[in-house]
Amino acid sequence: MKKIGIAITDPEDWTARALITAAKEKGFFPFILDLRIAEVSISSKTSEPATLFKAGEILLSDLDALIVRDVGAGAFEGVSFRFDILRELEAGGVTVMNSPEAIQNAANKYHASYLLARAGLPVPETVAVQSVEAALRAASGFGDAVIKPVFGYKGKDIARVKDGEIRFSDRKTGPGTVEEILEKLLEERGMLYIQEFIENPGRDIRAFVVGGKAIGAIYRKAAAGSWVNNLSRGGSADRCVLAEEQKEIAEKAALAVGTTFAGIDIIEGAKAQTGNENKKTEDKSTGQGSRILEVNGTPSGKGIFDAWGINPAEYILEYLQNIL
């Protein structure tokens, strides 16, 4: 029986539980572990392994595969250490899904935008800067701009700059002038990641891709009065049938970032239809076509399961079963 680890941080998380159940159903022996308690021993004694990787009582190097649901937040050195462990396990022959490189590619919004654009995929116009002057120029040039933390998640700490004001994702207007707020953000982050705001019908799309194939999608609709569509920010989910063009760019986005499974966030543009019907992606040159917003390398499967009854965990474990 193949031994697989499932790295989680919240035992009650829907996706974590779904992965554990699917692993058992596929005949795997799942080891549930938390990378935040992982330890590594390095020795030059011939009587001991050169390197010993443990998480609690689990010997990580004995695993056939490791599925990463969550690495866990924390200080820079701690998070970097966990990714080092994943890289070293991978080098030692453990199949890691998603790979540490892919998770980091997806988590870094700036680098993900670069990879997506390099692959010829449509993305919002984007500027990354390290000065307030450059940030003001970018925001002014876009007219309506969004500033996101490069390593943000769940729609937190997103700011929209429009008409001389900054509104944050909690819908409050930022205190101080735009310049003062940008100075504060730059001091905190060291750089600013700025995108044009894409006018849209009050929703975006989360497509789930496994093994290079889009298995389903949902609309994420913003809460009343909000401009942020994340479910974690009060948004709601509904069924979405992807147009062929949207399916194609979602699958290519997962490949461009290096993910085996991923949540691909797509924004449609203001002219999109507002039903659940198949939509056509408009010509990229019009500025109103579908664009890739982000790639999530550790996505939740709950939204698509609630909307469609599609369980991404089953697809992930089936893919893993086929490659081991």
Swiss-Prot record:
GO CC annotation terms, alphabetical: cytoplasm
The keyword Magnesium belongs to this UniProt entry's keyword annotation: yes
Binding site for Mn(2+) 2: 294, 296
Region (Disordered) location: 274-293
Positions annotated to bind Mn(2+) 1: 265, 294
Keywords of the record: ATP-binding, GTP-binding, Ligase, Magnesium, Manganese, Metal-binding, Nucleotide-binding
Cofactors named for this entry: Mg(2+); Mn(2+)
EC number: 6.3.2.33
Enzyme class: ligase
Chain residues that bind Mg(2+) 1: 265, 294
Family: Belongs to the RimK family. MptN subfamily.
Protein name listed in UniProt: Tetrahydromethanopterin:alpha-L-glutamate ligase
